[in-house]
From Swiss-Prot:
It comes from the Bacteria. Its EC number is 3.6.5.3. The gene is tuf. This is Elongation factor Tu. Residues 61-65 are annotated as: G2.
Amino acid sequence: MAKIDFDRSKEHVNIGTIGHVDHGKTTLTAAIATVLAKHVEGNEARDYGSIDNAPEERERGITINTSHIEYNTEKRHYAHVDCPGHADYVKNMITGAAQMDGAILVVAATDGPMPQTREHILLSKQVGVPKMVVFLNKVDLLGSGSEAEEMADLVEFEIRDLLSQYEFDGENTPVVRGSALKALNGEKAWEDKVMELMSQVDNWIDAPLREVDKPFLMAVEDVFTITGRGTVATGKVERGELKINEEVDIVGYTEKPKRTTVTGIEMFRKNLKTALAGDNAGLLLRGINREQIERGQVLAKPGTIVPHTKFKAAIYALKKEEGGRHTPFFKNYKPQFYFRTTDVTGGIELPNNIEMVTPGDNVDLIVDLISPIAVEVGTKFSIREGGRTVGAGSVTEIVK
């Protein structure tokens, strides 16, 4: 575990890059860290390779796993997650976006909004990202002059329209035009655009009201072992606070929770005395083997949440144009349901008066999962099938 204590003097905000594959999300992430390192103390420059760090990614040139970095503006400390852009990895987008208080939507001016741009905006709405700032990337490739300006204006108009369709504030959302690659390469005019972007992020994206007074809950994103110390579970603290030596329940996948004591807490390799709502924390768990905890379970204040398999839900079935199904689904349909950091297969029961659900429908139905999961009223989820998002929903009532 870490040696240095974490500094909490600045307001902490979780943010991330989203958008279509190859529009420049990872390059922009590297540019933000690198440009801020020149202007604000306490930042470390990053290159593309250090963020695009999973082996599969570089072989295929596509970002797969979510990558976490940190940086500071004059006003705030940010934890930044670089979200996957490739359609096959929307599953990871769901776990990554669930960690965001706001997003930077990256759109290449050369392409305009693409299918994954739309899907990421929809998913951001679904997982509760309240606001986003748009970075219109690669504007240098449009050339100069009035035609280039008109092209950029047109793309900006399309993006604003798309944001409004999904109930974001398309009219007032800040749009910054720039070149992530040229900023990363140190060209002053483009570096200034990155600073302008971060100023907009500071001002447009609100610091979240952290739910510190509610019972502690953290969804497990990853688990690893520290030799001689024990097992560490990492994830974003959804609500509440946790102090060292307090007990937590490991909930999900089994009928009964398993209880353990937290003997160490860290964030970005620095020690914490307390983990608070909004923190990306690593918790050292006493007496727990690597096999006794897995991604998708949650750590919670003892007795505050129990696993369930059956619940009522309000769902929206995506239209074909939104990347959803082309045909209706009927009772006994068995897709995957994605909660926080987990996916589990479940069957559906339709109300008596409904025979089928057509793409574009809003409907109330009952979900019956094959494994018990920590859910409660208000828990949001996505419905996936064959590698694509086909619906989005929210738990309205627990059945069992």
